[in-house]
């Protein structure tokens, strides 16, 4: 996963290149069976802000081999990108690629939810992430960092709702606001999120995008708002 917020619109082509690289060789848990086409070959998607709207483009084709990726010409100041490793290969199609968009919120997720969220996803034959997003849109009343912190804490503490989820690494965009949550229950070396903040651009990615300085590993339970050099964060401590 990759997301950035910048003071001025910028070309997303370099970030699309990183998505293609993550598709081919991004981190993978050793015990997982590798799928044909790379480490994360089961579709890709982006969400970006244009004219105060969040727009999405999604594909069920591996990012590393999809010609659409190289054809996109997008400049934006808010961006979310995701390449997918599907726990169930039968679900690989564009409509199951992240990010999902619902009622003005875009959400990309690494991990799997169980409980009622997972059951509803199976019954509707949709992603558990989409079901989670629909619930989040109802519960997130105040579209701020404190408001999101309350909503996510309540949802992730509800074992009946999300079960013993593997991780809730989330990138969340709404309007001009962009947030990242790193939350894992296992496989900490896989469910990573690194942040680099600056005056003009804040970036969060599953792995550092380059060897330059400034990357830091987000804490487990850390919720970060993209807001320049002094991006605020909250720690959702004590989650089950």
Map each language-model feature to its residues.
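Extreme N-terminus nucleophile/cap motif
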Residues: 1-62, 180, 185-188, 221-223, ...
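Short acidic (Asp/Glu) patches
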Residues: 58-73, 81-103, 116
């Amino acid at each position: 996963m990759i997301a950035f917020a910048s003071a001025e619109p910028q070309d997303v082509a370099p970030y699309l290149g990183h998505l293609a690289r993550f598709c081919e060789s991004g981190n993978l848990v050793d015990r997982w069976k590798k799928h044909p086409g790379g480490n994360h070959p089961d579709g890709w998607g982006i969400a970006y802000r244009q004219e105060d709207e969040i727009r999405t483009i999604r594909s069920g084709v591996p990012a590393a081999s999809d010609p659409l990726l190289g054809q996109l010409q997008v400049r934006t100041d808010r961006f979310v990108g995701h390449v997918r490793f599907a726990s169930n290969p039968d679900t690989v199609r564009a409509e199951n690629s992240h990010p999902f968009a619902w009622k003005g919120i875009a959400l990309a997720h690494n991990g799997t939810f169980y409980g009622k969220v997972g059951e509803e996803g199976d019954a509707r034959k949709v992603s558990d992430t989409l079901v989670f997003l629909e619930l989040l849109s109802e519960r997130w009343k105040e579209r701020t960092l404190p408001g999101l912190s309350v909503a996510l804490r309540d949802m992730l503490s509800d074992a009946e709702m999300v079960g013993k989820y593997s991780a809730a690494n989330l990138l969340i965009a709404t309007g001009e606001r962009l947030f990242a949550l790193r939350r894992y229950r296992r496989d900490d070396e896989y469910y990573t999120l690194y942040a680099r903040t600056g005056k003009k651009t804040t970036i969060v990615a599953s792995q550092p995008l380059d060897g330059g300085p400034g990357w830091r590993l987000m804490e487990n339970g850390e919720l970060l708002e993209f807001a320049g050099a002094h991006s605020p964060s909250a720690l959702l401590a004590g989650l089950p």
